[in-house]
From Swiss-Prot:
The modification Phosphoserine is found at S69, S188, S257, S292, S294, S301, S374. Essential cofactor of the RNA polymerase L that plays a central role in the transcription and replication by forming the polymerase complex with RNA polymerase L and recruiting L to the genomic N-RNA template for RNA synthesis. Also plays a central role in the encapsidation of nascent RNA chains by forming the encapsidation complex with the nucleocapsid protein N (N-P complex). Acts as a chaperone for newly synthesized free N protein, so-called N0, allowing encapsidation of nascent RNA chains during replication. This is Phosphoprotein. It is found in: Virion. It comes from Mumps orthorubulavirus (MuV). Homotetramer. Interacts (via multimerization domain) with polymerase L; this interaction forms the polymerase L-P complex. Interacts (via N-terminus) with N0 (via Ncore); this interaction allows P to chaperon N0 to avoid N polymerization before encapsidation. Interacts (via C-terminus) with N-RNA template; this interaction positions the polymerase on the template for both transcription and replication. Interacts with host RPS6KB1 kinase; this interaction may play a role in the viral replication and transcription.
Length: 391
């Protein structure tokens, strides 16, 4: 049912109501208890001439109800009931929308002669009647008469449905039809291939072309996108690991630089220690060391070449009884110890006293001891005392 009122119908209702209101406001009303000529509205008296039982009034047809007023801008166009449309039998005029009342007046029912067209107040009553009917009919839904619509499916009609025609169902109004819903036959959401539609006999023909070929399945596209997304995430994880290793490499480089700095410091300190204490030789000649490593026993059992042997080396000999006896080694004469040059050591110790000893009294004591020292051991003792005092 149409829930909206058209603008033209609204204008008709307003004009009808204004005509009725103007009629009752302009008509003179005199209150009385009797129906006399003085109280009858002009134009109504001829109605009383006819038989009251023959009450007949013509109602407007559907053609009159659906007509629109073209000259609404210039004024209201009255609705005229023609005498040619009079039916059989009289019909009582319904009571008007507004009762004609006055001082002590009563509402009177008036009947109309079939030969006389309604004028005056009857014309207003007819207008009100028509307006009421329009208002009632507007909110009453009419029954719909339509033929069943055959269902149309994609891919063209079947062999049995090719000869049938499709008649659309009317909605008797201006609203849009909701139509019928059908599930798509394509899982990917694309429009599949469709045949040409046959021309409809009861409708205006239209140009129909061949539908496009089926598009690529949307599921396959989504699978490809998901695979690319997974690979991208895997690459991102690898890049994160590489960046983490890079930070670790940077940390290792920093630690290596620290180790190198510490090692250089230790090497510098060791060089300083070597300068301060170069060390002492053992005092054993190299020849003696070599000879000690080459000593061995040689047995001469008979005549032969004994030039390789040395008389200084211990050798076993046979006595008269052929018994091996060692020949005693002759006693060695002790060699005098070479006099070492202590002047360089004294210069070094003097420099140590000057740089390492800050106390003047201790410095003076070390200088006195250095002047009295004549052996290497004494110089070593003085050097150790200087280092201890510096620490």
């Amino acid at each position: 049912m149409d829930q909206f009122i058209k603008q033209d119908e609204t204008g008709d209702l307003i004009e009808t109501g204004m005509n009725v209101a103007n009629h009752f406001l302009s008509a003179p009303i005199q209150g009385t208890n009797l129906l006399s000529k003085a109280t009858i509205i002009p134009g109504v008296a001829p109605v009383l001439i006819g038989n009251p039982e023959q009450k007949n009034i013509q109602y407007p047809t559907a053609s009159h109800q659906g007509s629109k007023s073209k000259g609404r801008s210039s004024g209201a166009k009255p609705i005229i009931v023609s005498s040619s449309e009079v039916g059989t039998g009289g019909t009582q005029i319904p009571e008007p929308l507004f009762a004609q009342t006055g001082q002590g007046g009563t509402v009177t029912t008036v009947y109309q002669d079939p030969t006389i067209q309604p004028t005056g107040s009857y014309r207003s009553v007819e207008l009100a009647k028509i307006g009421k009917e329009r208002m009632i009919n507007r909110f009453v839904e009419k029954p719909r008469t339509s033929t069943p619509v055959t269902e149309f499916k994609r891919g063209g009609p079947g062999a049995a449905a090719q000869g049938q025609t499709i008649q659309e169902e009317g909605i008797d109004g201006n609203g849009a039809s909701a139509g019928s819903k059908e599930r798509s036959g394509s899982l990917s959401g694309a429009t599949p291939y469709a045949h040409l539609s046959l021309p409809q006999q009861d409708s205006t023909p239209a140009n129909v072309g061949i539908a496009q070929q089926s598009a690529i399945s949307a599921n396959e596209i989504m699978d490809l996108l998901r695979g690319m997304d997974a690979r991208l995430q895997h690459l991102e994880q690898k890049v994160d690991k590489v960046l983490a290793q890079g930070s670790m490499v940077t940390q290792i480089k920093n630690e290596l630089s620290t180790v190198k700095t510490t090692l250089a410091t230790i090497e510098g300190m060791m060089a300083t220690v070597k300068i301060m204490d170069p060390g002492n030789p053992t005092g054993v000649p190299v020849d003696e060391l070599r000879r000690s490593f080459s000593d061995h026993v040689t047995i001469v059992s008979g005549p032969g070449d004994v030039s390789f042997s040395s008389s200084e080396e211990p050798t076993l000999y046979l006595d008269e009884l052929a018994r091996p006896i060692p020949k005693p080694r002759p006693a060695k004469q002790p060699k005098p110890q070479p006099v070492k040059d202590l002047a360089g050591r004294k210069v070094m110790i003097t420099k140590m006293i000057t740089d390492c000893v800050a106390n003047p009294q201790m410095k003076q004591a070390f200088e006195q001891r250095l002047a009295k020292a004549s052996t290497e051991d004494a110089l070593n003792d003085i050097k150790r005392d200087i280092i201890r005092s510096a620490i």
